[in-house]
Amino acid sequence: MKIGQVFRYPRDKNRKKKMIDGYDNFSYYTNCPNNKLVLLESGINPIQKVKNKDGVISPAILTSSSPHKIGSSDTPWQDFYNTSKGHIRYSGDNKDVGDPLRKKGNKILVQQFEIHNSNNYEIRKMASPIIFFKRVAANGALKGYVEFNGFGVITNAEMKVEHNRKSKVD
């Protein structure tokens, strides 16, 4: 995968087709034989865990940002992707009112933050890389395409409150 490369991410997944609608097929390029499909159905998507000599890990955690929704009543926050400087600020997963740390995806990222930043090498080597995608428009469609924006480790985590115009709650 190359930074900026756009993949077709259709509703009906197909691991065998290399190209769909003139774009590289996400499911073909992320195919892990004998494992579940690699999906981007929510904001935070861990790949199915596998066992290696050191234990059980998720090979990677994929995040998905939807810039076309920035500032909407549903998503008042904004993710920042500055791939030329190697910096991404991802806002997590919490559209609903409630404790954001109870959300599965946020909980996974907080756990990974602790692993990525551990002083203990044995713990750190169990870290899952974070892989970043943005949903983009292509072929006249707003959905069904994702752009690879790189991978990284978590260096900072903070709790941030945004006003939800839809529910009128902070």
Give the label of every model feature segment:
Residues 1-24:
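Second RecA-like catalytic domain
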Residues 17-145:
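Acidic, glycine-rich low-complexity segments with interspersed aromatic residues
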Residues 139-170:
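Compact mixed alphabeta submodule
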